[in-house]
């Protein structure tokens, strides 16, 4: 049974298949936070067309996290369109922030960010979020919120 996450956003639903075999600590962390309701009501605080959408910061600024960090998990997954990866502030600084890639290829990020899932439904929603009006810091003018639930199968 595959582990999936349903990310209900204010713009529609994104379904993600997670990669527990390739990034076990990262998937455990994401599923734990989701199960605790950590992501519920948070926003995508950084959206860049043809690059990615980023969320998971409790402050909504890109500066916050869960109060701890954990190490990177390198794997064979490319950082390309539809991939779910951890955002960080450098090596081994993963917490709660993540991004979903909208560009065809971002492999210059490979080895710098742990890939731990991919979009299996709702890539059109990801693209729509990445193209909302935003300010000079790439924050949407109108907040795009999320709720994350973990489902099996």
PLM regions with names:
Residues 1-153:
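Cyclophilin-like peptidyl-prolyl cis-trans isomerases
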